[in-house]
Curated annotation (Swiss-Prot):
Function, in words: Catalyzes the formation of pyridoxal 5'-phosphate from ribose 5-phosphate (RBP), glyceraldehyde 3-phosphate (G3P) and ammonia. The ammonia is provided by the PdxT subunit. Can also use ribulose 5-phosphate and dihydroxyacetone phosphate as substrates, resulting from enzyme-catalyzed isomerization of RBP and G3P, respectively.
Coiled-coil segments on the chain, per record: none
UniProt-listed CDD domains: pdxS (cd04727)
Protein's recorded name: Pyridoxal 5'-phosphate synthase subunit PdxS
Quaternary structure and partners: In the presence of PdxT, forms a dodecamer of heterodimers.
Catalytic reaction(s) noted: aldehydo-D-ribose 5-phosphate + D-glyceraldehyde 3-phosphate + L-glutamine = pyridoxal 5'-phosphate + L-glutamate + phosphate + 3 H2O + H(+)
Pathway stated in the Swiss-Prot or TrEMBL entry: Cofactor biosynthesis; pyridoxal 5'-phosphate biosynthesis
GO biological process: amino acid metabolic process; pyridoxal phosphate biosynthetic process; pyridoxine biosynthetic process
Residues where D-ribose 5-phosphate binds: 21, 150, 211, 232-233
UniProt xrefs under Gene3D superfamilies: Aldolase class I (3.20.20.70)
Source organism (scientific name): Francisella tularensis subsp. mediasiatica (strain FSC147)
Lineage of producing organism: Bacteria, Pseudomonadati, Pseudomonadota, Gammaproteobacteria, Thiotrichales
SUPFAM superfamilies: Ribulose-phoshate binding barrel
Gene: pdxS
């Protein structure tokens, strides 16, 4: 089995679950108790990165090690787009996945990280199919929508997942003779376009992130075809993080059962304060 197949296999194990952003060991323990399949270790959730401004970088290795020491579930951490040295440091710490993330300030405006040169699997964001296939071509083992992290607004994640699905359906139904032109237009590797044509799906798991704040948001993304959900600011910026985290985990498990969704949505306290997406968009970082 090739390295990429092993990496994809690790990503497949996260399907049907919730990955939660945490900023300290206490939050990591809450996330694990609530049923998270993995945690994302970072110093500031996206809502605070937006509010504080400045340059957002890889988290302090000490924080990441503290979080890794208190949970048994996989731990992810973020590196800046193109910052392969941050990725080397994260790999040396033993994190389970690296997210080459638009939430952090990009280090390279032209080049993403060569993910094939690492043993640790990478997560990457996308806004459309061409972007997804370019990241997979670089070695990403897991794709997620970018959405608009830190907003509590699901609209961009919905738009992006629908666009990816629309693009996949178009390629699936295209004539084989059209695939090279499609690859050219998408700026995507031809072999990956032919994979989508034959299989009607991405060659790696496709998750959703960016703006998920409620159980209904999580279920919406699952019904639209996401295979798992990342939740950032939506849990620990709410009034009752544990209860909301449990509810979102249940919503991902029972995303097609409206009665259960209604039950788990009751009495969760105030959600995070949402903001509109008509400012600098993190999703426009990277290409």
């Amino acid at each position: 089995m090739s390295d990429i197949n092993i990496k994809i296999g690790l990503a497949e194990m996260l399907k049907g679950g919730v990955i939660m952003d945490v900023v300290n060991a206490e939050q990591a323990e809450i996330a694990q108790q609530a049923g998270a399949v993995a945690v994302m270790a970072l110093e500031r959730v996206p809502a605070d990165i937006r509010k504080d401004g400045g340059i957002a970088r890889m988290s302090d290795p000490k924080l990441i090690k503290e979080i890794m020491s208190v949970v048994s579930i996989p731990v992810m951490a973020k590196a800046r787009i193109g910052h392969f040295v941050e990725a080397q440091i994260l790999e040396s710490l033993g994190v389970d996945f690296i997210d080459e993330s638009e939430v952090l300030t990009p280090a390279d405006e032209l080049n993403h990280i060569d993910k094939d040169s690492f043993k640790v699997p990478f997560v990457c964001g996308c806004t459309n199919l061409g972007e997804a296939l370019r990241r997979i071509g670089e070695g990403a083992a897991l794709i997620r929508t970018k959405g608009e992290a830190g907003t509590g607004n699901i609209v961009e994640a919905v738009r992006q997942l629908r666009q990816v699905n629309k693009d996949i359906n178009y390629i699936k139904n295209a004539d084989k003779s059209e695939l090279m032109a499609i690859a050219k237009n998408l700026q995507a590797p031809y072999d990956l376009v032919t994979y989508v044509h034959k299989n009607g799906k991405l060659p790696v798991p496709n998750f959703s992130a960016g703006g998920v704040a409620t159980p209904a948001d999580a279920a919406l993304m699952m019904q639209l075809g996401a295979e798992s959900v990342f939740v950032g600011s939506g849990i620990f910026k709410s009034a009752d993080p544990f209860k909301r985290a449990r509810a979102i985990v249940s919503a991902v498990t029972y995303y097609n059962d409206a009665k259960i969704l209604a039950e788990v949505s009751e009495d969760l306290g105030e959600p995070m304060t949402g903001i509109n997406c008509d400012f600098e968009k993190f999703s426009q970082r990277g290409w």
